[in-house]
Amino acid sequence: MEFLIDFCPYVIAALVLFALGFNLSRRENKMRQATHAAVSLPWYSWEAIASILLIALFSALRYYTGNDYRMYLTNFQQLQADGSLLRGNLEIGFVLVTKLIALTGCHFSVYFGFWGALQAFCLYYGLRHHKQLYCWIGLVLLLGPFCINWLTYLRQWTIAIAFVPMVPYFARRKFWPCLLFTLVAVTIHYSAWILMLLYFVPLVLKADRSRNFYLAIFAVCYLLGTYPVWLSPIASSRWLFSLVGYDKYQCLFQPLIEEHFVFKGYGPLRLIYLFQSLLFIWYYPAMREYYSRDKLFNAFFTLAFVGVCYQHLFINTVYALIRPADYLFIFVVIMMAYVFDYFMAIKKKFMLCVSCLVICSFTFISCYKEVYFLCKPAAECNLLYHFIPQL
């Protein structure tokens, strides 16, 4: 019973976000039918504002939910107690924001709520021209494969979501806005400089590429990741990890240097990762035609495709090697929202129900596995949602 109670906030928040997004999309469609024009409701409609506030509240009220929560909480509380930081190597921008909130005497819920509000604002603003996705975003983000990443990697996922409204600038190769964003992002998480590499990646793909082309690339990455012996020389290059800001994880790569790899079994979680990757790749050609007027669809697909290829290429290594892909996982969430919207539009109800059920079972299975297979008490499981004991 305790397990279900602690899991319910995920479901309730996801369903409310779905209802708000669905209502906004429905109102916009009615307005277009009435005016016979491609008019849009403002992105700051009450449903979007309510969604942002709900995500902020969801972030604010959590307590020891997410693997890194303890570190951020302890830093904040110690800063309020004696003005020092438990972890001294945090980035200057992140430290500045933390100090501004901590030294005003605010409760730590305000601190976590601020980051949740910032993330939600960037996500909804970045998708302001794609409001039909709003209803699906909440479901996939809270119940899908990357919810735990979002709740755990606070700094990295803040930058990842802030990158969403910047995609048009990267797609059009606007150098100065891209550079300015990267410089600001680096002050929140050092590894964000990796995003500048995307400036040189053609995000708008050729329209004549077939489904088999993308499946072949994904298959190669998947097979190479099955037994990554080719990684041993890379893992021994200390300068490489220092360059990308992961030098503190160097000790974790010793098993790779000695060719002791981590072979992950094909349980339900691994299969869901594989299913979602194949799903949006398989339907990409059809969706490309359906969303032909969507100027950012191809860019979103490219970023999601690179993300899942990278993930499966390194999935049998230490997780620190997969961490750079966290900047791209938000686009997998967006692509799954596109897939669900596409299924609804062409009335593929069976595929919509099956795929939505599979994808949105990930958080539940993760929590269930932690409690019932790893025998952790529900109160100690940092994947379940725990409310702060008192305000």
Which role does the model predict for each range below?
Residues 65, 70-73, 199-201, 206-324, ...:
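Alpha-helical transmembrane segments and terminal signal-anchor/GPI-anchor hydrophobic tails
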Residues 70-106:
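Short hydrophobic/aromatic helix or loop-helix immediately within or flanking a transmembrane segment
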Residues 92, 104-121:
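Loop-to-helix entry region of an early transmembrane alpha helix in multi-pass inner-membrane enzymes
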Residues 124-143:
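Transmembrane-helix signature of polytopic, membrane-embedded enzymes
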Residues 146, 177-201, 312:
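Membrane-interface alpha helices of multi-pass inner-membrane proteins
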Residues 151-157:
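Short acidic/glycine- and proline-prone juxtamembrane loop motifs at membrane-interface regions
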Residues 163-177:
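Membrane-interface transmembrane helices that cradle and orient dolichyl/undecaprenyl
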Residues 218-219, 344-366:
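Signature aromatic-anchored transmembrane alpha helix within multi-pass, membrane-resident enzymes
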